Amino acid sequence: MSDFLHLEEFLKIAQEEDLFTIIRSGPFICAEFEFGGHPSWLLRDNDIEFRTSNPTYVKHVTNFFNVLLPILAAFQFTNGGSIIMFQVENEYSISGKHDLEYLKILRTLMLNNGIVELLVTADNPNKGTYGTLPELFLMTGNFDQQVKTNLDRLKAIQPGRPTMTMEFWGGWFDYWGDEHNKNKTLAEFQYNYEEILKYPSSVNIYMFHGGTNFGFLNGAENLNFDEWETDYNSITSSYEYVAPLDEAGDYTDKYWATKELLEKYNPIKTALPSVPEAPQKTAYASITMEQELFLYDMLQTIQPVYAKNVIAMEKIEVNNGNGQSYGYVVYRKTNLNIPENAYLKIEGRICDTAMVLINGILVSPWLQKAADLNGFGTSRIVDSTLLLTKEAIQGATLDIVVENWGRVNVGVYKQFKGIWQGNGVKLNDEYIYDWTIYPLEFKSAWTTSLTGWSNFLSNSIGPAMYKGNLYISENPVDTFVYMEKWIKGIVIVNGFVIGRYARMGPIQTLYLPAPLLRQGNNEIVVFEHFRPSATVDFQNHHVYNNY
């Protein structure tokens, strides 16, 4: 993901385009991003308490800010840059914490690192001052309706100060297994946006431009903090958000409505530039899968770790002692004698989905429909139990492949991935010990160096990789990878994981921007959990459908 980390270049472009910039510098950013922006290796500190003045957490935040903030300070408006404002934390009132000393520490760190622009917090105004300190910060509001009520609350909290809607939600995001979110109609968007402008209040549309959770960087949501594990909802790779500009940069009805309202309420009439053409898109011809690589062969290329019992992926001793952050973890037990009618029990909850194989044969149910998320192999079930086989098998190899489907971004903090709750995994009434554990991370260098591929046969069942070639004769343009014929997995283009797909919906396509493609041959690899299709198709737009 290093190509996406050019912060200084991004800020230079904003300055060149004469834009003002508001920075949400963290350490928690929410944004439905994986773990709210926290790196998973923080979980290895047993005494850490996220989003508090806990010394361990503050130590890590300090180290982070001491690198990040000097970069940002150089781009402040007072230094000739575009940054006019810094948002401190995000919606702290619903964090499950109430440690205002923590907010003071963040402010001090920012001031000590040369930040001089306006510092603000952002919360739902009905929370009052629970997540802010009015004497230190300007409080802004996050909402999408009841505009006058919310802005009046902001005025009451901080009389004599300007009001700002920091997040005016113009749309919403999608969960896997849910319907495509259309809860903000054009009429609702227009009415509430105009109410803000009429008030008058400053306003930032969230999101103005839909985005993409490339790789494994989608977050997850829980609607009930007290019962979060039963209410886990993974967020799609697409963060299209039904925004004025969609994920691929196309204009929507909300864009034209926004333009019209800004022209109406802008007291300074200026000549507006013409609207640029939308980026070109195409539906490339379908490609045929040519090769396949099964899980057993994939794992031969990975250095395993050995453990008496199953452990969370973050606790695996890889990546220079930082553990595994993303992808999948495979728990393997060899030479296992399985009696007839044996049951496998995974104690606690699986985090987040699991496939079970015996001697390379998938024996667990497929996750094809939204209803399947309430069955075996998901985090919604406590002590998942599965009939392994009706017949006895001697000397078997048992594989449990667990997917990290995205960490919850707000409200839950000690959330490890893999199998780690309870006391382990049981075969009938006996715990299974002495595991071989493989971190399956899908790093680019590993993916592009794989060998041992065999010819594609199309009748494979279970987790495997499939490869085809997309040949582009001219300069590449944006496209959408259309995966409705497949079941569940990830798509990798030229070694880069562009995101996840799931036939259950609501979205059946993955946005593939032109810069990730090249003229000539493009390697398209699919890691499919259950059953492949013979082809990968393309569209020139997103496709939504539910199963």
Label every model-predicted segment:
Residues 1-3, 31-56, 225-242, 247:
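Aromatic- and acidic-residue-enriched carbohydrate-binding clefts of CAZyme catalytic domains
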Residues 1-34, 107-112, 116, 225:
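Aromatic-lined substrate-binding rim segments of carbohydrate-active enzymes
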Residues 1-13, 101, 340-348, 377-384, ...:
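Aromatic- and glycine-enriched glycan-recognition loops and surfaces
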Residues 3-23, 46-83:
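An active-site-proximal structural segment forming one wall of the substrate-binding cleft
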Residues 21-25, 84-88, 119-121, 139-141, ...:
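Hydrophobic faces of well-ordered beta-strands that scaffold small-molecule active sites
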Residues 58-71, 79-87, 93-94, 99-100, ...:
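Carbohydrate-binding surfaces of carbohydrate-active enzymes
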Residues 99-196:
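Noncatalytic carbohydrate-binding groove/subsite architecture in carbohydrate-active enzymes
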Residues 341-360, 398-400, 470-494, 501-502, ...:
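Aromatic-lined ligand-binding clefts that engage carbohydrates, nucleic acids, or primary amines
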